[in-house]
A protein has these predicted regions:
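Acetyl-CoA-dependent GNAT
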Residues: 8-12, 16-89, 93, 98, ...
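Conserved acetyl-CoA-binding loop-helix of GNAT-fold acetyltransferases
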Residues: 97, 103-116, 142-143
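Short loop/turn motifs at secondary-structure junctions
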Residues: 2, 91, 122-124
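Conserved GNAT acetyl-CoA-binding A-motif
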Residues: 118-130
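Conserved active-site alpha-helix within GNAT-family acetyltransferase domains
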Residues: 108, 120, 133-143
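Conserved catalytic-core motifs of GNAT/GCN5-like acyltransferases
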Residues: 29, 129-130, 142-143
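Ligand-binding pocket scaffold of soluble enzyme catalytic domains
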Residues: 3, 15, 36, 111, ...
Length: 143
């Protein structure tokens, strides 16, 4: 697998379609005694959801940060978009992996490379925001 910066020649890769993901539980975050903690609530029934497709503009993405693609034999498997921020951490704006390649380390490799590039830009690291009802994503980000 190759992790590459999305070039202008591959700008169409920024509009990788979103695919469905399973909603099977919720992460409940709390702060007790000056310590962060969380608990997990599993839904009685899971359901599937999909985000609307984005329409990213390559020039705008590059002006605000950078984008990485994960490729095998030039096939796009995953996408990560990072944005500059006024904080000391770069923002992971979007992360997606095709269903067929999820749980194979694609997202982790995209984040690893994004973290390296963020450090090169003078950031201390990266951060993101996750939806509490997307338990698979929340658990992934906790690793």
């Amino acid at each position: 697998m190759d992790i590459k910066l999305i070039s202008q020649e591959r700008a169409e890769d920024l509009n990788m379609p979103n695919e469905a993901f399973e909603l099977f539980g919720k992460l409940n975050v709390q702060r007790l005694d000056q310590q962060w903690d969380y608990s997990i609530h599993y839904f009685e029934e899971s359901k599937w959801d999909v985000f609307p497709d984005e329409s990213y503009d390559w020039q705008q993405v590059m002006t605000q940060g950078f984008a990485l693609g994960a490729y095998v034999d030039e096939q796009l498997l995953g996408l990560a978009i990072f944005q500059d921020d006024w904080k000391k951490f770069m923002y992971l704006h979007d992360l997606k992996v095709t269903q067929a390649f999820r749980k194979n380390g694609v997202a982790a490799e995209l984040i690893k490379k994004g973290h390296e590039l963020a450090l090169e830009r003078g950031y201390r690291g990266i951060y993101t925001i996750g939806q509490d009802n997307n338990l698979a994503a929340c658990r992934f980000y906790l690793k």
